[in-house]
Amino acid sequence: EQAHIMEDHCIHCGQCLEVCPQNAKTFASDMERVKGYLQRGVRTVLSLAPSYLSVLDFDQPGQVVDALMRLGFDEVRETAEGAALVTEEYQKLLKSGQMTNIISTCCPSINDLIEKYYPSLVPMMAPVVSPMIAHGRLIKQMYGPDVKVVFLGPCIAKKAEAVGDERVEGAINAILTFEEVIRWWREEGIRVEECEDKPMGNPDPGVNRLYPIGGGVITSVLTGGSEDHYEKFHAEGIKTCMELLDELTRGEVKGGFFELNVCKGGCVKGPAAERWKRSMLKARLDLEHQVKYTEEAVHIEHEPILLDKVFEDRYIQDDQPTERELTEVLRAMGKYTRQDELNCGACGYATCRAKAEAVYQGKAEISMCLPHAVAQAESMSNLVMDATPNMVLIVDRDMHIRECNKRMLDKLGISREEALERYIFEFIEVEDIEQVLEDKKSILRKRIQLETLDVIAKETIVYIESVDSALVVYQDVSKEEKAREQHMNLKMETIDIAQKV
């Protein structure tokens, strides 16, 4: 079985990619599509997220431009150019003062989170496209609708926004991550530090390069903006953002402009930038070093661009189990009483009942319950031990019985509790066991006679290094030996009779 993303519930935050040790999920790459554009000679412009300033290694920012153009792109322009357009729209909203609260809509994961899980807050969302979409539309206006626009950045949610949201379809043709481009440079033998310092294809976007860090949107909006009456707040990290959204849902805050980022630290710490392992402080300082806070973007003359976006209620109403259905799931998890509900949190859910509800809704598997899995494993292990016709026990270096199966207990004539307090030498000879524990060499299928148990057996003893003990298995062959003995006696009697005749 494999976990599958429930697209209608997903906010594309990338947490599953970051935390999964098995790398079971990967980012769907557009690399071949982009290479196809370049190989066919299609005019292709790259929209470069300003987070490159804190993620990529270079001596001069222009070296990144040259390295990208060597791959075949016709032009490299900063996404911050689109951010400048978004800043102007935010300033208009603030100046008008018509919205009770304004939530920035630059982060597509935050947009998904609100539309799917906080639909009552949709009216507070700034009705403006993201900087990436604004930039894509600007580039297509400049060069015509046939130009291909490729976005390069650290965010995987941009992919879902560009190709999965019909409201902004067509603005961006492909998405690449920094990791993908670095591999591409390596394949082509391009070393950024050896490249020329080339200028971007766009005018200076000024302070709008700060969008990728926490508070960057607010700083951009305040620079050159007119006075307004909104308090400015910024929050980063999904937990902090959800706490703030909960407060807004309760109506506890009014007259605020809220800049929210799902990624703690902002876009510079996006899921496709984690491999660099830069601290939030270092990433922020690297970017701030390249940006002049007080400079507005150089104005670009262009035809009017559609920057409006209508956000919607996309709330998913999950089926809720009845108390009886919930009880059935809990029983399947091995939770028969309230005392069985350990609420250990190992499955990722706060309580066993929350986990059971998720199982009912198809979001989780019963096997994800760690205590249940351990109990199942122990149950299966005990079943195997008890079902085997052989006598099995584990003995430590002191000859203390550590484990014993039912068949052995029957032969010893004692209970399991009593057996675990006894020594094996009280019942049988232990020379072979001592030898294996001393030499750490196994004995396999040795024929012996356990006189005290009235058993003829084939003995197998294996040393278990992890617990410094011996696994002892006796295969009872008494019946076979007696049958063989009877057959031999019959054979000898037949020979004896024949000789007498």
Question: Where does each model-flagged region fall?
Answer:
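A short beta-strand signature within small-molecule sensing/ligand-binding domains used
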Residues: T452-T460
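Short metal-coordination and nucleic-acid-contact micro-motifs, chiefly zinc-binding Cys/His arrays
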Residues: M6, H12-C16, G256-E259, T337-D340, ...
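Sensory modules in modular signal-transduction proteins
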Residues: Q376-K411
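Iron-sulfur-associated redox domains of electron-transfer enzymes in respiratory
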Residues: A28-Q317, P321-L330, A350-E357
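Terminal output helix/cap of sensory domains in signal transduction proteins
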Residues: E417-L453
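Iron-sulfur cluster-binding cysteine motifs and their immediate structural context
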Residues: E1-I11, Q15-M31, E274-W276, A346-Y360, ...
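Sensory coupling linkers of modular signal transduction proteins
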Residues: V462-V501
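Intrinsic disorder at enzyme termini
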Residues: A364-A373
